[in-house]
Structure formats: structure tokens, C-alpha cells
Design a protein with these regions (language model features):
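Acidic/polar low-complexity flexible segments
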Residues: 2-14, 85-106, 169-197
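Extracellular/luminal beta-rich ligand-recognition
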Residues: 82-146
Length: 197
């Protein structure tokens, strides 16, 4: 029997290499990670994809294995919680912003390395302006365990709507990540996105 290969339509699958930026002047190419003389801080490469799967959307991140990422992933993947939590962006976090095209309403999904997650609902850009943001109850997130590869880590999750199919071709989105390496003895946020705004 021949294998069935799914044929993707142009709006069914997108993959990006995320670009790293920081708002800190402490970050430059001479900085060394955690004072390790042999390990200059070069931001790990992160690739992200978003794909249509039946009635849901799949989001995945590949994080390059470096001394820094190996340290954080190996520590946190041992204690996977798989529960909702707020303020995940204050530590290493992977995010997907998803909205219907031509709509100001959107959801923000957050996933931490330890399995904590959340989905927030916004009526417009950061509206309502409250902390923590309003939890979204119309979507669910199903998370796969983090895959450990020779050269990196893969985080994957699915976003589903309770009452209707999500169609990626009808959506606008942004995939982002935040890592917090130690630079000059302080945690510094490094922001990743394929589209920084």
C-alpha cells in the first residue's frame, strides 16, 4: 500500500527563522555567557512553524542546542507541570498571537519550557489593559512533550476553538519567543520574532 502524503495549500504551512533582538545595551558580541570563557553568548537559533491540521492549528518551535539552552531545557523539562499559569513571559516563553484577518480581536498563547501555559483574549492591541490579561475560554491548548534532539529541542502545541474550526488561511499570526540569558550577572531578555513590531 502506498503512503498517503498530505498536500499543503499555500496558506496551510509557514516556517520562519526567528530574529533575536534585545533592548539592553549589555548585549554585544563580546559578552560571555555566565562568565564561561569558552562560550560567548551568541543567541541560539530558533525556527518556528505554524500549520493547519484538520480543524486546529499546530505551532512548533525548534531551539538550537547550546550550553545555555541545554542548561535551561534539561532543568525544566524534568518537572513538567502542564497547567495554566500567568506571567509566563517573565521567564523563557514561546508565544503565538492569532487573529482572524481584518479583526482587531486576537488570542495570545504562552508556553513555558516546564509545561505551564495560558491563552489570553484581547479585543484590540493589549486591550483591555490589565494584568494578568483576560483568560480565553473559547480555545484549548494541547501540548506535546518536548522532543530532545542531538542538535536542539522541539516544542509543539495545538490550538483548537471549542465551537468552530480554525482555518489558518483566514488568520494573521506572529510567532515569538523570549529567552533570559545571564549577561554581566543579570538576566537580560532576548526577544525572538519573525516580525518585530
Amino acid at each position: 500500500m502506498a503512503a498517503t502524503v498530505k498536500r499543503f495549500l499555500p496558506n496551510d504551512f509557514f516556517i520562519y527563522q526567528l530574529t533575536a533582538i534585545t533592548d539592553s545595551s549589555a548585549y554585544d558580541d563580546t559578552v560571555r555567557l555566565d562568565n564561561r570563557p569558552d562560550n560567548r553568548l551568541v543567541p541560539p537559533k530558533i525556527y518556528a512553524y505554524i500549520a493547519q491540521i484538520t480543524d486546529a492549528v499546530e505551532v512548533g518551535f525548534f531551539v538550537e542546542k547550546t550550553a545555555y539552552t541545554q542548561d535551561i531545557f534539561d532543568k525544566q523539562t524534568k518537572n513538567v507541570l502542564m497547567q495554566r499559569a500567568d506571567y509566563l513571559w517573565q521567564s523563557e516563553c514561546f508565544e503565538c498571537f492569532l487573529a482572524q484577518k481584518y479583526s482587531s480581536h486576537y488570542i495570545e498563547t504562552n508556553l513555558a519550557i516546564n509545561g505551564c501555559y495560558n491563552i489570553y483574549r484581547f479585543d484590540g492591541y493589549r486591550t483591555p489593559n490589565q494584568m494578568p490579561p483576560l483568560a480565553d475560554t473559547q480555545h484549548t491548548l494541547s501540548i506535546r512533550h518536548i522532543a530532545v534532539l542531538d542538535d536542539g529541542y522541539v516544542l509543539t502545541f495545538h490550538i483548537r476553538h471549542h465551537n468552530q474550526a480554525l482555518r489558518l488561511g483566514e488568520c494573521q499570526f506572529n510567532l515569538t519567543a523570549i529567552l533570559y540569558p545571564i549577561i554581566h550577572k543579570a538576566y537580560v531578555a532576548v526577544y525572538y520574532a519573525f516580525k518585530h513590531t
